[in-house]
Amino acid sequence: MYAVIKTGGQQFRVEQGTTLKIEKLEIESGKKVTFKEVLMVADGDNVRVGTPFVPKVTVEAKIISQGKEKKVHILKFRRRKHSMKQQGHRQLFTEIEIVKIKA
């Protein structure tokens, strides 16, 4: 059985036991979180697609850790002006493990 959930403006295909990194959630490590925005659920040949969400279906996950991604370097170079701007960004993420898909 697998499901497609929506969180942080992105969609993820998840199964029980799947570990993935999503946009940062303001929840402590070790706590549980429930995703109610389930776009699709499939169990063998039985596929249910929501409009936009499947009713009465939730996905439970456990927060494993919080962290930052690797740094992305941004360089803006102005030709012939002897000028450049350098900047870095580290995106915050939450690592979760899918515990259960309630369908």
UniProtKB/Swiss-Prot annotation:
InterPro entries: bL21-like (IPR028909), bL21-like_sf (IPR036164), Ribosomal_bL21 (IPR001787), Ribosomal_bL21_CS (IPR018258). Keywords: Ribonucleoprotein, Ribosomal protein, RNA-binding, rRNA-binding. One of its GO terms (biological process) is translation. It comes from the Bacteria. The keyword Transmembrane helix does not apply. GO terms for molecular function: rRNA binding; structural constituent of ribosome. This protein binds to 23S rRNA in the presence of protein L20. Belongs to the bacterial ribosomal protein bL21 family. Part of the 50S ribosomal subunit. Contacts protein L20. NCBIfam families: L21. This is Large ribosomal subunit protein bL21. The lineage of its organism: Bacteria, Pseudomonadati, Pseudomonadota, Gammaproteobacteria, Candidatus Pseudothioglobaceae. The gene is rplU.
